[in-house]
Curated annotation (Swiss-Prot):
GO terms for molecular function: ATP binding; magnesium ion binding; phosphoribosylglycinamide formyltransferase 2 activity; phosphoribosylglycinamide formyltransferase activity. Keywords: ATP-binding, Ligase, Magnesium, Metal-binding, Nucleotide-binding, Purine biosynthesis. InterPro entries: ATP-grasp, ATP-grasp_carboxylate-amine, ATP_grasp_subdomain_1, PreATP-grasp_dom_sf, PurT, PurT/PurK_preATP-grasp, PurT_C, Rudment_hybrid_motif. Its EC number is 6.3.1.21. Mg(2+) binds at residues 267, 279. This is Formate-dependent phosphoribosylglycinamide formyltransferase. The keyword rRNA-binding does not apply. It catalyses: N(1)-(5-phospho-beta-D-ribosyl)glycinamide + formate + ATP = N(2)-formyl-N(1)-(5-phospho-beta-D-ribosyl)glycinamide + ADP + phosphate + H(+). The gene is purT. The keyword Metal-binding applies. GO terms for cellular component: cytosol. It comes from Pasteurella multocida (strain Pm70). Transmembrane segments: none annotated. The lineage of its organism: Bacteria, Pseudomonadati, Pseudomonadota, Gammaproteobacteria, Pasteurellales.
Length: 393
């Protein structure tokens, strides 16, 4: 029997979020709706999820000793990683000491770098993937590009939101692609993956929930990325029954190997009826923000239920829907959003502003959500709303 205590009392059910971005913020809100006491941790102060949590801490989550000390101080019932840049060896140690890591410490460790998850998917599970090679230095990088062929995709083994990722289209770009990957890695310069370029009709995220009663799939989500960074997503993505069956089989296999409970974002390329595995995140996915308007239970609500061991009897899609990221470019510590009445003027349109304190370069600061009778109309509605938004730096 699942029980939940009262927050801020000795019997509270406590969750510690490691990483406090916009996805974590939505998870915190869903957990609090269920009466959970939440502690939000990040490397910088006043991160989005910290703004809504019961307590917040600012530490380097790559510092294993600091992380261990904080966990032992708070003694959470569940540790929920929201980002890759965490001392995963410490999570393994904490799990062995009796703490519950969501979904598992192994899943966090394998998916924090592209090498672990690619070797699991391709070499252990035999899932279809692009050709790939891992390299540590520039000379090996040049040889890998020659072997894989141009065009190819270059990524640091540890990065997120497209940082350090590029499509190499000519020999002349080899030095700049290497340098960009070295600058974009989460843990600094280092190992890189070179992937063969996959010709595909579209990309999907198949959100997959492992819960107390098994594995459930959300309707597939289509998306557009720019340099690996999500800009638009929609649900459902139309695909053949054969392709959907293959995608679900891949998702079930990879999430089953990672184990534990929670939501996973499984990214795949689709070409006709063929499906190729790309990546998996053992946490809510940015393209899944569309579920805030498309579903009865968003990916964040589903994650909260799965974490707590609560049942997920049904996943209901309300209507075709779309999301459009609000990406702000420039430099400011006091971004102001205007024309909001106009942005929200149409029915079934919504908005999330993440509360991020500053931008320096470009940064995702919010998302526009829209529902309609078709994905196409929902996308048009989201774009219309976006065009009305005013941003002052």
């Amino acid at each position: 029997m699942t029980t939940i205590g009262t927050p801020l009392t000795p019997k509270a059910t406590k969750v510690m979020m490691l990483g406090s971005g916009e996805l974590g913020k939505e998870v915190v809100i869903e957990l609090q709706r269920l009466g959970v006491e939440v502690i939000a941790v990040d490397r910088y102060a006043n991160a989005p999820a910290q703004q809504v949590a019961h307590r917040a801490y600012t530490i380097s989550m790559l510092d294993g000793e600091a992380l261990k000390a904080l966990v032992e101080k708070e003694k959470p019932d569940y540790i929920v990683p929201e980002v890759e840049a965490i001392a995963t060896a410490t999570l393994v140690e904490l799990e062995q000491a009796g703490f519950t890591v969501i979904p598992t410490a192994k899943a966090t460790q394998l998916t924090m770098n592209r090498e672990g998850i690619r070797r699991l998917a391709a070499e252990e599970l035999g899932l279809p993937t692009s050709n790939y090679q891992f390299v540590d230095n520039f000379d090996d990088f040049k040889r890998a590009v020659e072997k894989i062929g141009i065009p190819c995709v270059v990524k640091p083994i540890m990065s997120s939101s497209g940082h350090g990722q590029s499509i190499l289209k000519s020999v002349e770009q080899i030095p700049s692609a290497w340098e960009y990957a070295q600058q974009g890695g989460r843990a600094g310069a280092g190992r890189v993956i070179v992937e063969g370029f996959v010709k595909f009709d579209y990309e999907i995220t198949l959100l997959t929930v492992r819960h107390v009663h098994g594995t459930s799939f959300l309707a597939p989500i289509g998306h557009i990325q720019i340099d690996g960074d999500y800009r638009e997503s929609w649900q459902p993505q139309a695909m053949s029954a054969v392709a959907l069956e293959k995608a679900q089989a891949i998702a079930e296999k990879i999430t089953g190997a990672l184990g534990g409970r929670g939501i996973f974002g499984v990214e795949m390329f689709v070409c006709g009826d063929e499906v190729i595995f790309n990546e998996v995140s053992p946490r809510p996915h940015d393209t899944g923000m569309v579920t805030l308007i498309s579903q009865e239970l968003s990916e964040f609500a589903l994650h909260a239920r799965a974490i707590l061991g609560l049942p997920i009897p049904d996943i209901t899609l309300i209507s075709p829907s779309a999301s459009k990221a609000i990406v702000v470019e420039g430099k400011s510590t006091q971004v102001v959003f205007g024309q909001l009445a106009e942005v929200l003027a149409e029915p079934h349109t919504n908005l999330r502003l993440f509360g991020k304190g500053e931008v320096d370069g470009h940064r995702r600061m919010g998302v526009i959500l829209a529902r309609d009778i078709s994905v196409e109309k929902a996308l048009e509605k989201a774009r219309r709303a976006y065009d009305k938004l005013e941003i002052a730096l």
